[in-house]
Amino acid sequence: MSVANSRTAVYPGTFDPITNGHIDLVNRAAPLFERVVVGVAYSPSKGPALSLERRVALAQEALAAHANVEVRGFDTLLAHFVREMGAGVLLRGLRAVSDFEYEFQMASMNRHLIPEVETLFLTPAEQYSFISSSLVREIARLGGDVSGFVPASVVEALRQVRQSRAQA
């Protein structure tokens, strides 16, 4: 087991897909820490539109400008992943008051599982506060334009998913 390091933060999520809101959070977190690990969760129970490998690749591309940010996929308990990364901080985004109850429960559970790790909440810039991966997926599934919410590579990946489902 690694010792928790407050200079290393883990930002976990399914990132299905990564959005401009996620990117904004990483852009603001990167200067605060020596190392930020974006942990892309496998989460098969959520029925992701994109494979874990594709989500990791899209996040790596979107965050490539940051030398201190790394993207890793994981399929373990978050507490185990955080310990494996040696992180002392768990980053979570809060878009709206509606996110708070769930995030508070998760932070409390994580405090029991990994008491040496602090949860830090960041809010996105106002222009990203309404963006969610699930809304982006739904808009894309129905043929809407998601280019204002995600990087161009994600727009293309979602277009490919829609096209392959239409052919199935």
Swiss-Prot record:
- Say which species the protein is native to: Xanthomonas axonopodis pv. citri (strain 306)
Listed InterPro entries: Cyt_trans-like (IPR004821), PPAT (IPR001980), Rossmann-like_a/b/a_fold (IPR014729)
Main EC class the enzyme belongs to: transferase
UniProt-listed GO biological process terms: coenzyme A biosynthetic process
Chemical reaction(s) catalysed: (R)-4'-phosphopantetheine + ATP + H(+) = 3'-dephospho-CoA + diphosphate
Listed EC numbers? 2.7.7.3
Q: Name one Pfam family in it.
A: CTP_transf_like
- Named cofactor requirement(s): Mg(2+)
For the ligand (ATP), the binding residues are T14, F15, H22, G93, L94, R95, E103, Y128, S129, F130, I131, S132, S133, S134
Superkingdom of source: Bacteria
Write out the GO cellular component annotations: cytoplasm
Oligomeric state and interaction partners are given as: Homohexamer.
- GO MF term list: ATP binding; pantetheine-phosphate adenylyltransferase activity
Q: Which UniProt keywords apply?
A: ATP-binding, Coenzyme A biosynthesis, Cytoplasm, Magnesium, Nucleotide-binding, Nucleotidyltransferase, Transferase
Where does this protein reside within or beyond the cell?
A: Cytoplasm
Give a short account of what the protein does. Reversibly transfers an adenylyl group from ATP to 4'-phosphopantetheine, yielding dephospho-CoA (dPCoA) and pyrophosphate.
Residues marked Transition state stabilizer (site): H22
Q: Which family does it belong to?
A: Belongs to the bacterial CoaD family.
Q: What is this protein called?
A: Phosphopantetheine adenylyltransferase
The pathway this protein participates in, as annotated, is:
Cofactor biosynthesis; coenzyme A biosynthesis; CoA from (R)-pantothenate: step 4/5
Q: Where does substrate bind?
A: T14, K46, L78, R92
